[in-house]
Amino acid sequence: MERKRIVSGIRSTGDLHIGHYLGVLKNWVELQKEYQCFYFIADWHALTSEYRDPSIIRKSAKDMVMVWLSVGIDPAQSVIFRQSDVKAHAELFLLLSMITPLSWLERNPTYKEMKEELKEKDLSTFGFLGYPVLQAADIVLYHADKVPIGEDQLPHLELTREIARRFNFIYGEGILKEPKEILTEAARVLGIDGRKMSKSYGNALFIYETGETLKQKVMNMLTDVKRMRKRDPGEPMDCNLYPLHEYFTPEEMRAEIRTGCRSAGLGCVECKQILLTNLIREFEPIWKKIDYYNEHAGI
């Protein structure tokens, strides 16, 4: 039986962080076992915010592919490509933009959110307003059956379906496929300062860090504000650190951390050292593979 088709991409705007690893890449690795997967470097999408310095996009694209390969994205199982190498993305974007009402774009619930997150950049451009149309083109171009997304991205996919539906109504039924969602669990991790983990905020733990840099970041992470001193009891669920333990620390050890935090038997520094050890254990094999691809980039 022919496998269902999936399309997904990541903007090449900088280094990938642990949120990408947990929320996207680990899902991609599993999905490629069951679906026909098309994974792409969204370099045209990256231009919506990085148009003043495209060198960032070029470097990020290369680094991104090395990370993808190192975490387990297999070119023998998945199609990996750069968006700008397939000109049909731009052609279909142009055609879809002709039939997409402006009001559909203006009501996009993440438009204001992204403008706030990237407020240091000038995003008063047609490209930024119209990026959901390019996103729709990316998906329907490949007749994708499904798209892996988090719950917060459902409005984007619904807009893609609306655009495809309108196109088919005008030009003929069945031309464009309306994709369905595969809901993936969003990574519940925060940055070192307690805000959403983001390259833009400068608070991210990146997938490819030196051990020393990672140590410095982990040791500077905010913890439960109630724990001003080691002898003060805390609550793991109120700590920025604990969600990372849920992903990288075995349950038996997590139980000890919860007990130790609530009884003040375990200090925050010790808790951070445990997390650091587990992060290094998880990512050290990935770092070695990235180093290999860096050394053999010409092959």
Residue ranges of predicted features:
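Classical nucleotidyltransferase
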Residues: E91-F93, S103, R107-E116, E120-I170, ...
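N-terminal Rossmann-like or analogous alpha/beta NTP/dinucleotide-binding catalytic cores
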Residues: E2-A137
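Short alpha-helical patches at coil-to-helix transitions and adjacent helical residues
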Residues: Y21-V24, H89, Q153-L157, L241
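Divalent metal-coordination and catalytic microenvironments
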Residues: W68, L96, D152, G194, ...
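Conserved nucleotide- and phosphate/pyrophosphate-binding catalytic cores
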Residues: I18, P155, R161-I299
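A generic structural motif
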Residues: S12, V147-P148, N203
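Short amphipathic alpha-helical interaction patches enriched in hydrophobic/aromatic residues
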Residues: T48, R52, A144, K226-R229, ...
